Amino acid sequence: MTERSDRDVSPALTVGEGDIDVSLRPRSLREFIGQPRVREQLQLVIEGAKNRGGTPDHILLSGPPGLGKTSLAMIIAAELGSSLRVTSGPALERAGDLAAMLSNLVEHDVLFIDEIHRIARPAEEMLYLAMEDFRVDVVVGKGPGATSIPLEVAPFTLVGATTRSGALTGPLRDRFGFTAHMDFYEPAELERVLARSAGILGIELGADAGAEIARRSRGTPRIANRLLRRVRDFAEVRADGVITRDVAKAALEVYDVDELGLDRLDRAVLSALTRSFGGGPVGVSTLAVAVGEEAATVEEVCEPFLVRAGMVARTPRGRVATALAWTHLGMTPPVGASQPGLFE
């Protein structure tokens, strides 16, 4: 399941957001904000390959959605002066789909496969040989009369992106020469992202307003940029177009994003967990019924951030509200309420 894209605090792209997202993408490692260790490592990989006149090792980018994996893939191709071919794991259902794409590559091309953990097994097995030996074996015919025809593939660099690195098979993961994990952003880094985006979009953003938006953005640049556009709309309609801290706070209140970045659904989960079930433990299915959502939505959409924020703890018996959750809802934690990290 992918995260619902109708929430302002969803890290997934919303419908119609792609074109805006592209306009804000950095074009080089120098422009890319945040992830300093990953940027330094990629710079070495890229410069080393350019000095040798060859192709870099295959690169795996892992981490939560909305942190810039696709942007980095585009930057890698640009820094290498190579063409970028883009596809996704779900689009590669058959080995023939992958063979057709590989056969069209030219030397030094960068092939980007998003959600690579969702690639179908037949295509994945073909990818092994292409990554290792730059060739594929295409099977022609069926049954005893089938024959395998080897096809050469131009030397290329595969950049794979995944939000679930643990879902990759061992053989596929082992064929990546370089793996980088991307972490959530610090508020100060998001302030820089917002300042850059505001400049591109022609938005007058006060420094304190940027800080207000940044701390509600769940450590995710995509969410920060989305909230910036929401606040811009509010500023243009109900203020003088200038985004001050007060304007940002008023706008985000309208859009139901609180000071920690929680929205209505997040607070509904916390409210049910505390008010209806006394803080837990309670199973995900029961919790989902209480908030009128599917269990997968609660587990995959709400829970990761609530756990990371220290408001919900996973235990063998179910989910438990921490003292921070009670406090955030304006209630006094009961005696014995768990502290963040107790069950981690």
Curated annotation (Swiss-Prot):
Region (Small ATPAse domain (RuvB-S)): 186-256
Record-listed DNA binding positions: R314, R319
Domain remark from Swiss-Prot or TrEMBL: Has 3 domains, the large (RuvB-L) and small ATPase (RuvB-S) domains and the C-terminal head (RuvB-H) domain. The head domain binds DNA, while the ATPase domains jointly bind ATP, ADP or are empty depending on the state of the subunit in the translocation cycle. During a single DNA translocation step the structure of each domain remains the same, but their relative positions change.
Family of the protein in this entry: Belongs to the RuvB family.
EC numbers: 3.6.4.-
Gene that this sequence comes from: ruvB
Region (Head domain (RuvB-H)) residue spans: 259-344
Subunit relationships: Homohexamer. Forms an RuvA(8)-RuvB(12)-Holliday junction (HJ) complex. HJ DNA is sandwiched between 2 RuvA tetramers; dsDNA enters through RuvA and exits via RuvB. An RuvB hexamer assembles on each DNA strand where it exits the tetramer. Each RuvB hexamer is contacted by two RuvA subunits (via domain III) on 2 adjacent RuvB subunits; this complex drives branch migration. In the full resolvosome a probable DNA-RuvA(4)-RuvB(12)-RuvC(2) complex forms which resolves the HJ.
Described function: The RuvA-RuvB-RuvC complex processes Holliday junction (HJ) DNA during genetic recombination and DNA repair, while the RuvA-RuvB complex plays an important role in the rescue of blocked DNA replication forks via replication fork reversal (RFR). RuvA specifically binds to HJ cruciform DNA, conferring on it an open structure. The RuvB hexamer acts as an ATP-dependent pump, pulling dsDNA into and through the RuvAB complex. RuvB forms 2 homohexamers on either side of HJ DNA bound by 1 or 2 RuvA tetramers; 4 subunits per hexamer contact DNA at a time.
Protein name: Holliday junction branch migration complex subunit RuvB
Enzyme class: hydrolase
UniProt GO MF annotations: ATP binding; ATP hydrolysis activity; four-way junction DNA binding; four-way junction helicase activity
Ligand binding (Mg(2+)): T70
Residue ranges of the TM segments: none
Catalytic activity annotation: ATP + H2O = ADP + phosphate + H(+)
CDD domains: AAA
UniProt record, GO biological process: DNA recombination; DNA repair
Residues annotated for ATP binding in this entry: L24, R25, G66, K69, T70, S71, E132, D133, F134, R175, Y185, R222
Keyword Nucleotide-binding on entry: yes
Compartmental location: Cytoplasm
Keywords of the record: ATP-binding, Cytoplasm, DNA damage, DNA recombination, DNA repair, DNA-binding, Hydrolase, Nucleotide-binding
Keyword Cytoplasm: yes
Region (Large ATPase domain (RuvB-L)): 1-185
